[in-house]
Amino acid sequence: MDKTLKFTDSHEWVRDNGDGTVTIGISEHAQEMLGDVVFVDLPDVEDEVEAGESFSLVESVKAASDIYSPVTGEVVEINEELEDSPELINEEPYEGGWIVKVKLSDPSELDDLKDAEEYLSSIEEE
């Protein structure tokens, strides 16, 4: 796992791209709990997302799960490959399976997220 990632309690990850944007996806743990992903409902570019609010839905053979934004900002890019290949979330949750890129409204929100070590400790307790 990439040690520079930040995580939420609801199993989303965030990668700071260093240019005022972040990439968001779901963790390996989350995709394992969901099982085989069959559909991802992506937001639109220019949609506003709010920290803690649902912005996407991932459907798997087991369940449909809301995806919550870890940060507030504007969607600047969506992973269009997920429309035809939603299984990328299972195969490459931290690389090809990213969901959106968001331009941050408040970069300090990143400070509220867990680092990789804190996140791994929290899922071991589940």
Curated annotation (Swiss-Prot):
Function: The glycine cleavage system catalyzes the degradation of glycine. The H protein shuttles the methylamine group of glycine from the P protein to the T protein.
GO biological process, one term: glycine decarboxylation via glycine cleavage system
Keyword set includes Phosphoprotein: no
Keyword terms of this UniProt record: Lipoyl
CDD domains the record matches: GCS_H (cd06848)
Entry GO CC: cytosol; glycine cleavage complex
PANTHER family from the UniProt entry: GLYCINE CLEAVAGE SYSTEM H PROTEIN, GLYCINE CLEAVAGE SYSTEM H PROTEIN-RELATED
Pfam families assigned to the protein according to its UniProt record, in alphabetical order: GCV_H
Cofactor: (R)-lipoate
Lineage: Bacteria, Pseudomonadati, Pseudomonadota, Gammaproteobacteria, Vibrionales
Domain Lipoyl-binding: residue ranges: 21-103
Cofactor binding note from Swiss-Prot or TrEMBL: Binds 1 lipoyl cofactor covalently.
InterPro entries: Biotin_lipoyl (IPR000089), GCV_H (IPR002930), GCV_H/Fam206 (IPR033753), GCV_H_sub (IPR017453), Single_hybrid_motif (IPR011053)
Keyword presence, Metal-binding: no
Family statement: Belongs to the GcvH family.
Signal peptide stretch: none
Quaternary data: The glycine cleavage system is composed of four proteins: P, T, L and H.
N6-lipoyllysine sites (modified residues): K62
Record organism: Vibrio parahaemolyticus serotype O3:K6 (strain RIMD 2210633)
Protein name from the UniProt record: Glycine cleavage system H protein
